[in-house]
From Swiss-Prot:
Cell wall formation. Catalyzes the addition of glutamate to the nucleotide precursor UDP-N-acetylmuramoyl-L-alanine (UMA). This is UDP-N-acetylmuramoylalanine--D-glutamate ligase. One of its GO terms (cellular component) is cytoplasm. It is an enzyme of class 6 (ligase). The keyword Cell division applies. GO terms for biological process: cell division; cell wall organization; peptidoglycan biosynthetic process; regulation of cell shape. Keywords: ATP-binding, Cell cycle, Cell division, Cell shape, Cell wall biogenesis/degradation, Cytoplasm, Ligase, Nucleotide-binding, Peptidoglycan synthesis. InterPro entries: Mur-like_cat_sf, Mur_ligase_C, Mur_ligase_C_dom_sf, Mur_ligase_cen, MurD. It holds the Pfam family Mur_ligase_M. Pathway: Cell wall biogenesis; peptidoglycan biosynthesis. Its EC number is 6.3.2.9. ATP binds at residues 91-97. It is found in: Cytoplasm.
Length: 415
């Protein structure tokens, strides 16, 4: 077999190395270095391996399908060489937090546990290091679209809202890409579903289902059926959405034979990932949070629910992915004292909310942070939760979040 790997970021390089080490003949390139190479070699290869960021509208993808070439992603490729257990976690929001917490629990009790996928480390790098063990994978819709034989032993579909319509041709395609992650599961496998969401509830899978509706949550306990999982008061990660994220990690651990008393301390010690409702400090009675990972209105909604009514000075906006900000009117009216809108979506946000709360548009993130400092008062919360991707102003959400932290350091601690 001959392969073409297209896209030479970290996942593409991992796929290339894996194929070469397994003795396959491989062509490789990307749009920035040799954009026409694929046209020269496509006829010679059997399989095209695409990096996650390459959309279905790309001419290589279209031409490969036209020529009846197999099109897969790096995750599917790596899976074909992996011999261990696979845990696959997906959702519009919360999947990184849940993946990391699951990984932290399992690595305490099992040898050879790996975290990979959309969270940062390509699965192919794991397979090169050790093709066995337990792989805890965060799986995006981009990765889901190119899966073929992938079959997780344990799956989790934890949240869904409209997203990535700049990449997927439709909502249906986005959802179908999520479903594909679980479609090869059998009765021997498990699938944890947030069945409180209609689109997730109807996920097609033959796996044994573990459902959110079977969870019971009160002020000091989370139960799955009659099993007490943990005390939500002891969590360091804020918000009801994080109670559910911790519940999913707990349910995965239960499925693998662990008991709550074994792993609850790991849950209580977990402080969350950077840029996810990250507490930056209390500055003269004003709390500041960095939620740069918020790339959807759904994520913003969960963040706002965490704070008292009419307390939030919200910095919001970024690249326009076709998001619906009008749908947030109820929670914005209840929680937001003033919204400071930035990026491509600033006028769209203003038009959606201007009759329910004060909205000011800012040309830069620095302008917004400076204004937030000026208008904030004792008891207020300054929340940076963009509800958009970062690509209009920054390379990624990490760079955006780090810039926000730098600006908070300047305007909140030095003034």
């Amino acid at each position: 077999m001959k392969f073409l790997v297209w896209g030479l970021g970290r996942s593409g390089k991992g796929a290339l190395k894996l194929l070469k080490e397994r003795g396959f003949e491989v062509y490789a390139g990307d749009d920035s270095q040799n954009p026409e190479l694929w046209r020269e070699v496509l006829g010679e290869v059997d399989t095209v391996v695409l990096s996650p960021g390459i959309p279905p509208s790309h001419p290589l993808w279209k031409e490969a399908l036209k020529k009846e070439k197999e099109v897969v992603g790096e995750l599917e490729l790596a899976y074909r060489f992996f011999k261990g257990k696979v845990i696959a976690i997906t959702g519009t929001d919360g999947k990184s937090t849940t993946t990391r917490l699951t990984y932290l629990i399992l690595k305490k009790f099992f040898d050879e546990v790996f975290e990979a996928g959309n969270i940062g480390k390509p699965f192919s790098e794991v397979v090169l290091e050790n093709p066995e063990g337990i792989a805890v994978l965060e799986v995006s819709s981009f990765q889901g679209k190119t899966l073929k034989t992938f079959r997780p032993n344990i799956g989790a579909f934890i949240s869904f809202s409209v997203d990535h319509l700049d990449w997927h041709p439709s909502i249906e395609d986005y959802l179908k890409s999520k479903y594909r992650i679980f479609e090869n599961q059998t009765e021997e496998d498990f699938l944890i579903l947030n069945d409180l969401v209609y689109e997730i509830k109807k996920t097609p899978s033959r796996a044994r289902k573990v459902l959110f509706s079977e969870l019971y949550i009160n002020s000091d306990s989370v139960f799955y059926k009659d099993i007490r999982l943990f005390n939500p008061k002891n969590l360091k990660i804020r918000g009801l959405h994080n109670v559910y994220n911790a519940s999913v990690a707990s349910l995965i651990a239960l499925t693998l034979g662990l008991k709550p008393e074994d792993f609850e301390e790991v849950i209580y010690e977990f402080r969350g990932l950077p840029h996810r409702l990250e507490f930056l400090g209390n500055f003269n009675g004003v709390e500041v949070y960095n939620d740069s990972k918020s790339t959807t209105p759904h994520a913003l909604m969960h963040a706002l629910k965490t704070f008292p009514d009419n307390s939030v000075i919200l910095i919001v906006g970024g690249k326009d992915k076709g998001a619906d900000f009008y749908s947030l009117r109820h929670i914005v009216q209840k929680k937001v004292k003033i919204a400071l809108a930035i990026g491509e979506t600033k006028e769209k946000i203003k038009d959606s909310w201007k009759d329910i709360t004060e909205v000011k548009t800012c040309n830069t993130l620095e302008e917004a942070v400076k204004l937030a400092r000026e208008v904030s008062k004792l008891g207020n919360v300054v929340l940076f939760s963009p509800a958009c991707s970062s690509f209009d102003m920054f390379r990624n959400y990490e760079e955006r979040g780090e810039k926000f932290k730098e600006l908070v350091e300047i305007w909140f601690t030095r003034t």
